[in-house]
Amino acid sequence: MAWHFRRVIAEQVSRVLGLPSESCSRVAQCIQTVPVHRKHESPDFQLFMTSLSEGGPNGTFSNQEERAEQLAGKLVCDSVISDIGTTRGSVTFKINRDLLTRNVLQQISKDGSLYGLNTELFSELSRRKTIVEYSSPNIAKKFHVGHLRSTIIGNFIANLKQAVGNEVVRINYLGDWGLQFGLLGAGFSSFGSKEKLLANPLQHLFEVYVKVNTAAEKDNGIKLSAQEFLRRLEGGDPHALSLWMHFRDISIQEYAKIYKRLGAHFDDYSGESFYKEKSQEVLKQLESKGLLLKTDKGTVIDLSEEGNLSSYSTVMRSDGTSLYITRDMAAAVDRMERYNFDEMIYVTDKSQKNHFQQLFKILKIMGKDQADRCQHVPFGLVQGMKTRRGEVVFLEDVLDEARSRMLQNMAASETSKQLDDPSDTAEKIGIAALIVQDFKGQLVSDYHFDWDQALQSTGDTGVFLQYTHARLHSLQALRCPRDTEDFEIASLREPCVIATLQHLLRYDEVIYKCLEDLQPRYLVTYLLSLGHLANVAHRTLQVKGSSSEAAHARLLFFKNVQMVLGNGMKLLGITPVNNM
């Protein structure tokens, strides 16, 4: 909604400055929002004179102040703009407070879950077909903490793209092929147990993998057996394929339990195995174009600009078996043909940056136009994530720990309510804590995880967001708001209400910024600020004991704040709780 008011201001500024009508959009982009204050009113928008200068800032500070005074003197207040002022070389604008209140509350009530997504800001965005590949664990291995980041980041990006109207395909590209599976397949006959596999599938397969890796370091024969098992797999050996399929099926069944806890889902479970044959077709295409070179270590493709192999990628081992990048090439080509996507986003840790740079370059060399539509979203490492028992290895341990700690905190709290399912509520709050802690900074940055900090109910945490949402929801039990077209604006003129409405006005711009950068931190910061503003308003505004008209207006206000807070939390992948 903020863009609408920017445009109204920009139209008047453009007229006064004698600018052509096509300049209005550029002027609107120069108009900035003013930081919201919780306890006193501030203007809504600000236009710095330097931003209107062609080629950037010019002139002295006093010149800019004088220009601001001159421009402000020519502008007039109207039904939209109630006050025009100047400060530090800029012109400030205050929106008519009654108009702001009525427009924001009515728009939220009308749009519901779509609030902020139907504004002018998004009107010119084309609806696209988006593929998001994320999570992508290696089968027969338990989730580790890195999979938490890939899963929740990918889920957020997919949610965001879907929210703005894109057709989104969520792909879980399983690591279900390659030499590591050769090791597991060869090692299961020596270290595996059908009984243990049935009792705790992923834990037992992990134990087998550790044992066979340790043994392979001392016995080269085991490495050779692993290579032989992989060759048998790629050759279609029935016994090897049967064992592989069994491990794959039970892995997906176990992963589904984790995804359910995280609120993640996928449209397509594919994997490297799907492309073992297609990868050979891709290699033939490259060979027919004279792009492959054979070396002692395998077959490579030259990626250097000079053609001197200063940069290259190995696409086939010397024994003829395929590599991870070969299967990724085949997967990308297949998706281009199958989905005809507008963009494909890969979400992995930053250590794979070079891999994706090579992949996209190879696709370009192959003449695939959609290579330019591929993007890698890298993320950093989580450090210091431990349970009470010690260093965490598996994601399941982290989720259990979050639930356990929240149950303890809820039991110790004097304000906790009687809940139908305390464990489920604790799980949702704990996962909110993990997501907010993860999303606060730049995704590519490493960060140190702190349980005590993440689970605070009063700081900038997921627990605080859940607490605020539940608190706002509890107000609705007092009285049901009536028709949103008719409410007493005079009961909503306190500075804390205006500050909250100013913040709600800017929701669409925050979503747009997230869409530009694919970074959730903007939305996290916005929601935390909204939570603090809502709590100030909750302490200030009286509902009980006020007149029917005042109570109705204030309950409508709180209901709409709760709706936007909940909408934003859902975009992040958080399930809001109504009681805690």
Swiss-Prot record:
<dbReference type="InterPro" id="IPR001278">
    <property type="entry name" value="Arg-tRNA-ligase"/>
</dbReference>
<feature type="binding site">
    <location>
        <position position="352"/>
    </location>
    <ligand>
        <name>L-arginine</name>
    </ligand>
</feature>
<dbReference type="InterPro" id="IPR009080">
    <property type="entry name" value="tRNAsynth_Ia_anticodon-bd"/>
</dbReference>
<feature type="binding site">
    <location>
        <position position="328"/>
    </location>
    <ligand>
        <name>L-arginine</name>
    </ligand>
</feature>
<feature type="binding site">
    <location>
        <begin position="136"/>
        <end position="138"/>
    </location>
    <ligand>
        <name>L-arginine</name>
    </ligand>
</feature>
<protein>
    <recommendedName>
        <fullName>Probable arginine--tRNA ligase, mitochondrial</fullName>
        <ecNumber>6.1.1.19</ecNumber>
    </recommendedName>
</protein>
<dbReference type="InterPro" id="IPR036695">
    <property type="entry name" value="Arg-tRNA-synth_N_sf"/>
</dbReference>
<keyword id="KW-0472">Membrane</keyword>
<dbReference type="InterPro" id="IPR014729">
    <property type="entry name" value="Rossmann-like_a/b/a_fold"/>
</dbReference>
<keyword id="KW-0809">Transit peptide</keyword>
<feature type="short sequence motif" description="'HIGH' region">
    <location>
        <begin position="136"/>
        <end position="147"/>
    </location>
</feature>
<keyword id="KW-0547">Nucleotide-binding</keyword>
<feature type="binding site">
    <location>
        <position position="324"/>
    </location>
    <ligand>
        <name>L-arginine</name>
    </ligand>
</feature>
<comment type="similarity">
    <text>Belongs to the class-I aminoacyl-tRNA synthetase family.</text>
</comment>
<keyword id="KW-0067">ATP-binding</keyword>
<dbReference type="GO" id="GO:0005524">
    <property type="term" value="F:ATP binding"/>
</dbReference>
<dbReference type="GO" id="GO:0005739">
    <property type="term" value="C:mitochondrion"/>
</dbReference>
<comment type="function">
    <text>Catalyzes the attachment of arginine to tRNA(Arg) in a two-step reaction: arginine is first activated by ATP to form Arg-AMP and then transferred to the acceptor end of tRNA(Arg).</text>
</comment>
<dbReference type="GO" id="GO:0032543">
    <property type="term" value="P:mitochondrial translation"/>
</dbReference>
<keyword id="KW-0436">Ligase</keyword>
<dbReference type="InterPro" id="IPR035684">
    <property type="entry name" value="ArgRS_core"/>
</dbReference>
<dbReference type="Pfam" id="PF00750">
    <property type="entry name" value="tRNA-synt_1d"/>
</dbReference>
<feature type="transit peptide" description="Mitochondrion">
    <location>
        <begin position="1"/>
        <end position="16"/>
    </location>
</feature>
<dbReference type="GO" id="GO:0031966">
    <property type="term" value="C:mitochondrial membrane"/>
</dbReference>
<keyword id="KW-0030">Aminoacyl-tRNA synthetase</keyword>
<dbReference type="InterPro" id="IPR001412">
    <property type="entry name" value="aa-tRNA-synth_I_CS"/>
</dbReference>
<dbReference type="InterPro" id="IPR008909">
    <property type="entry name" value="DALR_anticod-bd"/>
</dbReference>
<dbReference type="GO" id="GO:0006420">
    <property type="term" value="P:arginyl-tRNA aminoacylation"/>
</dbReference>
<keyword id="KW-0648">Protein biosynthesis</keyword>
<dbReference type="Pfam" id="PF05746">
    <property type="entry name" value="DALR_1"/>
</dbReference>
<dbReference type="GO" id="GO:0004814">
    <property type="term" value="F:arginine-tRNA ligase activity"/>
</dbReference>
<keyword id="KW-0496">Mitochondrion</keyword>
<feature type="binding site">
    <location>
        <position position="147"/>
    </location>
    <ligand>
        <name>L-arginine</name>
    </ligand>
</feature>
